[in-house]
Amino acid sequence: AGKVSQEIIDAIDAAGLGKNLEVLGYVSHDEALKLQRQAALLLLIEIDAPITKGIIAGKLFEYLAAARPILAVGPADGDVQDIIEQTKAGAYFSYGSIEAIKTFILNSFESFNLSDYLSKNNLEIEKYHRRNLTERLATIIKN
């Protein structure tokens, strides 16, 4: 869902994958969250620049709440990578890790189980719930 550039659509078509692509355009936030919970795999792509290592997109927290596996791509050794590895919520790859990404996708679909993929990591993921993050921030401010 959302805006997809024509360049990306053309690249998907050129790779012979156009028949697997459904461009939904913009949807409501509630609909986006529903789609996330229904997904077999969630894709999070960060800008490939060292400056983004310390930037955590809000989408990551929505993805964690969706309890679906996350395939993230971005610069190595950043905060997003740390969170994904700590929560075991998926896998993080640097740009150019094509074979490793392919293997992760294939393994994810082979072991796909909508009901319990991330349930075993729920405690780690719960640390990043908005309520818990707000509580931690309030404690920091008070002290």
Task: Show which residues each predicted segment covers.
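Nucleotide-activated donor-binding/catalytic signature segment of Leloir-type glycosyltransferases, i.e.
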Residues: 2, 6-33
